[in-house]
Amino acid sequence: MKEIISVTILLILIMDPLGNLPIFMSILKHLEPQRRKKILIREMMIALLIMLLFLFAGEKILIFLNLRAETVSVSGGIILFLIAIKMIFPTYESKKKSGNIIKREEPFLVPLAIPLVAGPSLLATLMLLSHQYPKKILYLIGSLLIAWMITVVILLLSDIFLRLFGSKGVNALERLMGLILIMLSTQMFLDGIKSWFYI
């Protein structure tokens, strides 16, 4: 049970629904509310299929590449640490890229499903998890589905969240999520180091 909760929290933090709220709203704001919901659900379904594919194929990919679990754990911890740093200290360039991603036409696959939800960092994490817990794939699927559903709900209720917290409140929550992700990534890194040196 603890593993499901920790993996679910990790996946939610990487999906970063609060950080993606303003981008999703900007991309879909020119559409009718009903059409907006349909597109959002469609894109989230596509993202889920892609994430499940990487979760199931991740173990086989890592075996094919002949990577040890310790190596994947250390490198995964470093990647997640860098993501968390960007969440806490967003740079001007990252904000500029977020602004450039906004388009007026109706989105399909890119940029909502990929890379905003099913981004490279999340897909790499799913591969890592499937490699670390090959016998607990059902637990991983459950964690992924819970994280995905929470993300869907937050994005569907984007208007309410932005009215409730405001842009500054959402930014503060995202920084808090980044702080939690730093702790999780550090633990992942240390676990990999301990396993490598048989501590």
From Swiss-Prot:
Could you identify this protein by its name? Answer: UPF0056 membrane protein bbp_399
> How does the entry describe its membrane topology?
Multi-pass membrane protein
Superkingdom assignment: Bacteria
What NCBIfam families does its record include? NAAT family transporter, PRK10739.1
Q: Does Transmembrane count among this protein's keywords?
A: yes
Q: Which UniProt keywords apply?
A: Cell membrane, Membrane, Transmembrane, Transmembrane helix
**Signal sequence extent:** none
Recorded family membership: Belongs to the UPF0056 (MarC) family.
Its main localization is membrane
TM region positions:
7-29, 39-58, 71-93, 108-130, 137-156, 176-198
Quote the subcellular location field of this record. Answer: Cell membrane
Keyword match Transmembrane helix: yes
List, alphabetically, the PANTHER family matched.
UPF0056 INNER MEMBRANE PROTEIN YHGN, UPF0056 MEMBRANE PROTEIN YHCE
Gene Ontology, cellular component aspect: plasma membrane
